[in-house]
């Protein structure tokens, strides 16, 4: 598979945007009370916040490695882009099924846009 330099450069710039989109969605979901809405996913608010903080710190820690084009980091970034595409799509689909607001619905398009653009640009 051919890896084009301009794809890497674009991906390097898109990854921080995806991390920021994850932060914004985590904030929306927390404020909207997602963690208490579904029994199977019910988490104590403290755990919900700590989990997302740890996740965001991990994702942010990858930014320099992605920026330097380290292959392992680019692969993780692409995997994370796919996870966020699925996450964003699921929030939007559930909102459509419920025909109303679903926590994370407003920020889900950010995950879809940044995730799809990043996954497309990182053809590794």
Place the predicted regions along the sequence by residue.
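Membrane-interface helix-boundary motifs at transmembrane edges
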Residues: 3-9, 65-74, 124
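Hydrophobic cores of alpha-helical transmembrane segments in multi-pass inner/ER membrane proteins
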Residues: 53-61, 109-121
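Membrane-helix boundary connector in multi-pass membrane proteins
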Residues: 70-71, 81-82, 88-106, 121-124
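Membrane-interfacial loop-to-transmembrane alpha-helix junctions, especially the N-terminal start
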Residues: 9-16, 72-80
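Non-cytosolic membrane-interface motifs at loop->transmembrane helix junctions
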Residues: 38-45, 96-110
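"…centered on the first transmembrane helix and the immediately adjacent amphipathic helix/loop
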Residues: 33-37
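Cytosolic juxtamembrane helix and N-cap/initiation of the first transmembrane helix
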Residues: 1-21
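Core segments of alpha-helical transmembrane spans in multipass integral membrane proteins
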Residues: 17-32, 43-66, 79-82
